[in-house]
Design a protein with these regions (language model features):
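A short structural micro-motif
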Residues: 89, 151-152
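An active-site-proximal "capping" alpha-helix that borders the catalytic cofactor pocket
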Residues: 63-70, 124-137, 145
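Structural motif
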Residues: 75, 135-136, 166
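A short hydrophobic/aromatic micro-motif that marks alpha-helical segments and, especially, helix-coil
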Residues: 102, 152-153
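Cytosolic nucleotide-binding catalytic cores of signal-transduction proteins
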Residues: 142, 146, 150, 157
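Acidic/His-rich, divalent-metal-binding segments that scaffold phosphate/diphosphate chemistry
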Residues: 2-120, 139
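Single conserved hydrophobic/aromatic residue that forms the stacking wall/gate
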Residues: 155-166
Length: 166
C-alpha cells in the first residue's frame, strides 16, 4: 500500500517535469504556466503596475471581460485572461503618451506631428513584443500582444485626428 503511495508521488513529480519539457520542446502552454503568468506579482505585471498604473488597470479590466466572454463561447479562458493581462506591456516604453497614464494635464502629443504621435502609439505593439522576448513569454501570449489592434494598417483620418490626438 505504501509502495503505491511512494510510486504515485514520484510519478506526480515526473508529471510536472514532463509538462515543462513538453512546453519547451513543442511550444505547448499548460494551464499551470498560464496561472503562473497571470499572477499580478509576476515581474512584468508588477513592473507594468508601477510604471503604467492606468494601463495596468485597463489590462485587468480587459482580462476579466475577455475571460468571461471566452467562457461563454467555449474558448480557453485562462489563455485569454493571461494574454489580455500582457497585451499592452509595450506601453511601458513611453507611458506618458497614453491617456490612461497621463496626469497633471500634460499631454506630450501636443509637441509632436500627427505622424510622430501615431508612430509612438502604434509602436507599443513592437515594444511589447521586445519586452515579451526579454521576459521569455510564450508564443501564445506574444500573439495577443501582436494582434490586439488587429492585423490591418492603422489609419487615423484627417477629420478625426483631433479626437484622438489633443
Amino acid at each position: 500500500m505504501f509502495l503505491y503511495f511512494g510510486i504515485n508521488g514520484v510519478l506526480l513529480l515526473f508529471a510536472y517535469l514532463l509538462i515543462y519539457l513538453l512546453e519547451k520542446t513543442f511550444g505547448f502552454i499548460s494551464n499551470v504556466t498560464l496561472v503562473e503568468l497571470s499572477d499580478i506579482n509576476s515581474p512584468v505585471l508588477r513592473q507594468l503596475s508601477e510604471i503604467c498604473p492606468g494601463t495596468f488597470q485597463h489590462s485587468m479590466q480587459v482580462a476579466n471581460l475577455a475571460a468571461e466572454a471566452a467562457i461563454r463561447v467555449g474558448a480557453k479562458s485562462q489563455l485569454v485572461r493571461t494574454g489580455a493581462l500582457y497585451h499592452d506591456i509595450g506601453k511601458m516604453e513611453n507611458p506618458a503618451f497614453f491617456t490612461e497614464n497621463q496626469s497633471g494635464g500634460v499631454n506630450p502629443h501636443k509637441n509632436l506631428s500627427y505622424e510622430q504621435s501615431a508612430q509612438v502609439v502604434i509602436s507599443h505593439v513592437t515594444d511589447g513584443l521586445k519586452l515579451a522576448d526579454k521576459h521569455n513569454l510564450p508564443k501564445a501570449v506574444k500573439d495577443f500582444i501582436s494582434t490586439h489592434h488587429g492585423l490591418s494598417l492603422i489609419h487615423i483620418s484627417e477629420p478625426t485626428r483631433p479626437l484622438y490626438i489633443s
